[in-house]
């Protein structure tokens, strides 16, 4: 993994200026991967001098001294230009998150922070179930106001599809019907995609068709969804 130099700060400055001049509600988030980075493209930036090792790879990269201190250095450099600071981590570690937050807030007390509750972590390898449950609340107390799971949808959709395929293979339509019953039950909690035609806006386009007089081709009025899902 390579580290982006802090000399890239003019890019943040330009983005901040453009957003402010245009009056656009833009959120600029600065991310650093310096916690795990092992290489950096050059050694000419004075802000990198404490972390560049004077040893180069065959491709010309400099070796980089990674870790939380490098993340803090970059975070402090990014803070004047970024709405959110995000340091990417290798494990879910509250102590590490606190060290970063404390160092940033000592200089920029109102700086908002971001944290990736990554699906690349084996969560139960590092935290108990109770610790997993309180992890994000503890992050919030430290100033991590934007917390997210990258690729949560990818993992949930693939697991759900795999489990449905297993049930369908073993039990045919009974396997699908069981999932459908869970959909019906979930409607009480706000789930809406039982009626997939409605969910994708078919009713809206039916209204458009009716408004222009093309009523013979509307989809919802005679559909099985309209007849069977109420």
Task: Give each language-model segment a name.
Residues 32-36, 90-93, 117-121, 153-155:
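Active-site-proximal loop/turn and secondary-structure-junction residues that shape catalytic pockets
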Residues 119-121, 129-130, 134-145, 149-230:
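Extended, intrinsically disordered, low-complexity segments
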Residues 26-32, 85-87, 111-117, 146-150:
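Hydrophobic faces of well-ordered beta-strands that scaffold small-molecule active sites
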Residues 29-72, 119-131:
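Active-site mouth loops of central-metabolism enzymes
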Residues 15, 78, 139:
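Conserved, mostly hydrophobic/aromatic
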Residues 62-74, 83-96, 148-150:
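Catalytic beta/alpha-barrel core
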Residues 12-21, 98-109:
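Surface-exposed amphipathic alpha-helices with a cationic face
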């Amino acid at each position: 993994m390579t580290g982006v130099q802090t000399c890239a700060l003019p890019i943040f400055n330009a983005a901040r200026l453009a957003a402010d001049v245009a009056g656009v509600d833009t959120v600029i988030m600065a991310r650093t991967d310096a916690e795990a980075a092992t290489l950096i493209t050059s050694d000419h930036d004075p802000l990198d001098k404490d972390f560049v090792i004077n040893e180069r790879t065959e491709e010309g990269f400099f070796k980089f001294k990674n870790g939380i201190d490098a993340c803090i250095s970059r975070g402090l450099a990014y803070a004047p230009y970024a709405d959110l600071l995000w340091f990417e981590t290798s494990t879910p570690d509250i102590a590490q998150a606190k060290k970063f937050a404390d160092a940033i807030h000592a200089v920029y007390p109102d700086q908002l922070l971001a944290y990736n509750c990554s699906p690349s972590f084996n969560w139960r390898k590092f935290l108990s179930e109770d610790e997993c449950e309180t992890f994000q609340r503890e992050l919030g107390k430290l100033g991590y106001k934007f917390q997210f799971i990258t690729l949560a949808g990818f993992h949930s959709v693939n697991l759900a599809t795999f489990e449905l395929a297993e049930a369908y293979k073993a039990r045919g339509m009974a396997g699908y019907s069981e999932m459908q019953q869970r959909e019906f039950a979930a409607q009480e909690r706000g789930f809406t995609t039982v009626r997939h035609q409605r969910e994708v806006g078919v009713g809206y386009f039916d209204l458009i068709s009716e408004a222009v007089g093309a009523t013979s081709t509307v989809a919802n009025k005679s559909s099985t969804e309209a007849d069977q899902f109420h």
